[in-house]
Amino acid sequence: MGAAVKLSDILEYQPVRERWPGLFEAVKAIGAPSIQHFSGTIGGNLCQDNRCQFYDQSKFFRAARQTCNKAGGSTCFAWKGGSDKCHSACQSDSAPILIAMDAKVVIKSKDETRTMPLEELYSSVGERPLTLADNEMLTEIVVPVQVPGAGAAFEKLAYRSSIDYAMVSAGAFVQTEGGRTLRARLVIGAVARGPLSIATVEKTLKNRPAGDQQAINEVAIDAMNTAEAFIANNMTQPIEYRTKMVSVIAKRALTRATERAVSQKGFLEAK
């Protein structure tokens, strides 16, 4: 998939809805239709800059206080007590689901072409959130073919689902075999400086009955606890609310991904 492919082209391409419903959901959640049809691309969504309520303001607004890290200063107003690191949030809607699905990206420069896992595109450094060198650009996204018994789902919490940036988002991938979970990934978006992979998800879910709500609840709580260490006051919504909602969004994504994996009819749910 070329990085310059328009979001609307992805939504209108039937195989995406049938084979990668989680990706369809994420792309559908990006911006208003005017953005999807005229200016929005999948590469642009993956490479967008991090956001923060203190940085994304006019020069007049920012002139009223000390310059923050992202603007070239030496403090972060989003972090309680200040910080020498920028704690802006990665707001890409497509990144969590694509990382959960083990997507790779092709990076090109004048002299070199390289392929790497999508998660390696993100530096988790708020001032410079991408690992791209100045002479490099993202040219392709490679999405694996969905294997039998696998399902993926995307969830987003926002005031207005498509128009607003996410308060919290989640991409989940689950592969089942013989009624049990074989593989699983969960990636939380909009809470940290880069997409946040929950390391314990596969260990917790592997070999458990597919759809085991106790196991899914354990992962959801672990996701919330993990996010709590990274989440900052970089949005207008309270940190406490966003932190608690991580578990809710994670549970929804994992539950629907598992249902799709078991039913193999996930494309019917992507509307």
Q: What positions do the PLM features span?
A:
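C-terminal structural segment of proteins
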Residues: 1-271
